[in-house]
């Protein structure tokens, strides 16, 4: 519905099957070193607390409650309304390719700087990684939509990923400068 009003989320995860309140309160994020998770765009919340009280909160009113609730995994209360900072609707172009993991690891910092959104998926049973980049473009969407990795369309059509394969996904938080060595250590352990 945002698109009908010329608007979009500033960032979103690559899974679009959850409710907005759940995506916000779990820290759902996309990729990009200069993009924040969804909770950073929240300006205000309406909550129903365990006591049954209805509370409206933001940075000026009930600020501590607001900060706890917007990334609180639902522990503070039930989110019943959200006020968010939005972006104008945008066309994104997706690119993708495969590379050898060992070669890719040394390029990660440069790829993060070069691309608005950069991510990769490594398949531990092989030496290959699938790379995905997404850039905002000042061009028209291209329909019908191309295959994933080649789409050029509005953000809500490009950012979600199709996941037909069963998989287990894990996310770790390490300082960015230690990321390549951390990945190399995991790869050595699994090989």
What label would you give each PLM region?
Residues 1-191:
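Noncatalytic alpha-helical scaffold of FAD-dependent oxidoreductases
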């Amino acid at each position: 519905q945002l698109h009908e009003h010329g608007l979009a989320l500033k960032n979103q995860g690559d899974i679009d099957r959850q409710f907005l309140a759940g995506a916000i309160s779990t820290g759902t994020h996309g990729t990009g070193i200069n993009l924040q998770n969804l909770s950073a765009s929240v300006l205000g919340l309406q909550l129903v607390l365990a006591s049954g009280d209805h509370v409206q909160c933001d940075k000026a009113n009930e600020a501590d409650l607001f900060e706890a609730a917007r990334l609180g995994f639902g522990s503070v209360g039930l989110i019943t309304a959200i006020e968010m900072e939005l972006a104008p609707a945008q066309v994104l172009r997706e690119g993708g390719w495969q590379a050898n993991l060992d070669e890719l690891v040394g390029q990660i910092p440069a790829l993060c700087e070069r691309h608005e959104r950069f991510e990769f998926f490594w398949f531990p049973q092989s030496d290959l990684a699938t790379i995905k980049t997404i850039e905002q473009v000042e061009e028209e969407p291209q329909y019908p939509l191309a295959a994933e990795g080649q789409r050029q369309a509005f953000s809500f059509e490009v950012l979600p990923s199709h996941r037909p394969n069963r998989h287990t996904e894990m996310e770790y938080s390490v300082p960015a400068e230690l990321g390549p060595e951390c990945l190399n250590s995991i790869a050595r352990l699994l090989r």
